[in-house]
């Protein structure tokens, strides 16, 4: 049976992604000086204005307006005619401390208060919020990500590369990509449709943009065997994309959660990542769920695997662990879930310890996806639990 699936990505200059990157740049700057800081940093951007807000509890000082301007400059917004200017935009900050009502549950988990866990056992911290988190992996690509989002991210990164490298100097920072993949019997066989929308200078013609993007962006990224004469390609389908960035649309942190994860191919718990320190399970437990799912697929126990975790605020142990292999598992999903419980410690402090999350590693994942990153050595992307998973599978 044939079916189509579509995923999108955005470039680092997309207004929402500007916000994600500033949020994580602030987080990184704080973690570099104070690894145990509590950070929840949100950003909004609009024409000529950046608003940085949130709750931060830390012993250190960081220059938030400078961090915001530096991030905007790195993205490429250096002139007002691009839609934003790092040097002339206004930066407003509104920062409070973390609520003491939240802090009391994170500082000491319910289990520790009840004497079920010692204070010094992996810090004995509770989850920073309730909620459910999903992780996913599949064998469609070398990085065990779904093909549509994998290709959409690569196209978006290529847009930034040809812009910053001067290959297509008329491009500007804002842009989006979208890829529709055709599947036969659940395996990707071809790319059905590609959409690329990229901001550009007013002088360049649509025909030139179309030809250049096909030659310098699409052809180097999409595998030749995945393109055919029936593949539909749309480049700037409105015909013009000069006004972009925060001048074209306002932006907010956490508004691209599907781009950040699996492109809609797997379920999502609803929590965003950027600007949150690792005591927030929205971030750390979603990373852990990906780590679990990827190791299960890498071990060959399934072709596809989705892991759901759930937490209560102030409680360390996950309330539930669910595994779904969509009928591709070599053993029952319930048995795989038992293996997960034996192999992975999914309490927040253990996740932070095992994935070494109290480091300034977040800004670089704030654009082009948090998962399946071939360009980064991310701890949640490692497949170092394969051997122990296979050993446990033999004993079950």
Curated annotation (Swiss-Prot):
L-methionine binds at residues 55, 98, 249, 280. Pathway: Amino-acid biosynthesis; S-adenosyl-L-methionine biosynthesis; S-adenosyl-L-methionine from L-methionine: step 1/1. One of its GO terms (biological process) is one-carbon metabolic process. K(+) binds at residue 42. Keywords: ATP-binding, Cytoplasm, Magnesium, Metal-binding, Nucleotide-binding, One-carbon metabolism, Potassium, Transferase. It is found in: Cytoplasm. CDD domains: S-AdoMet_synt. It comes from the Bacteria. Belongs to the AdoMet synthase family. This is S-adenosylmethionine synthase. It comes from Caldicellulosiruptor saccharolyticus (strain ATCC 43494 / DSM 8903 / Tp8T 6331).
